[in-house]
């Protein structure tokens, strides 16, 4: 019984191609997994940008608090309801 080599070579090549396709679509490092990781990276970049902007705002606020008393005075008036000596506070009811 003699094996026809082109037939077996064809079968081996088809099996190798099927194995590679399986890894491409389903296995570790598949296209779906790469797409999910790219989405996670994009989401993380967005979150990082949001946090960087928040940090810039907080840094500016801290610098303003360190440099002047205007901001401290404004926060004391609005958040704590404080008034200066000699001032009278009038609250209007709605």
UniProtKB/Swiss-Prot annotation:
Topology feature Cytoplasmic, residues: 1-8
Coiled-coil segments: 31-78
Keyword Membrane: yes
Localization of this protein: Cell inner membrane
Record keywords, A-Z: Cell cycle, Cell division, Cell inner membrane, Cell membrane, Coiled coil, Membrane, Transmembrane, Transmembrane helix
GO cellular component, one term: cell division site
Membrane topology summary: Single-pass type II membrane protein
GO biological process: one example: FtsZ-dependent cytokinesis
Keyword Coiled coil annotated: yes
Record-annotated membrane-spanning stretches: 9-26
Alphabetical list of Pfam families matching this protein: DivIC
Topology Periplasmic: residue spans: 27-94
Entry similarity comment: Belongs to the FtsB family.
Task performed by this protein: Essential cell division protein. May link together the upstream cell division proteins, which are predominantly cytoplasmic, with the downstream cell division proteins, which are predominantly periplasmic.
HAMAP family: FtsB (MF_00599)
Quaternary context: Part of a complex composed of FtsB, FtsL and FtsQ.
UniProt-recorded name of the protein: Cell division protein FtsB
Gene expressing this chain: ftsB
């Amino acid at each position: 019984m003699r094996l026809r080599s082109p037939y077996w070579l064809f079968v081996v090549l088809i099996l190798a191609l099927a194995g590679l396709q399986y890894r491409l679509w389903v296995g570790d490092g598949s296209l779906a997994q790469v797409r999910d990781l790219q989405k996670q990276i994009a989401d993380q970049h967005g979150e990082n940008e949001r946090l960087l902007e928040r940090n810039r705002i907080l840094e500016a606020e801290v610098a303003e608090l360190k440099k002047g008393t205007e901001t401290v005075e404004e926060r004391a008036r609005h958040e704590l309801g404080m008034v200066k000596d000699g001032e009278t506070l009038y609250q209007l009811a709605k």
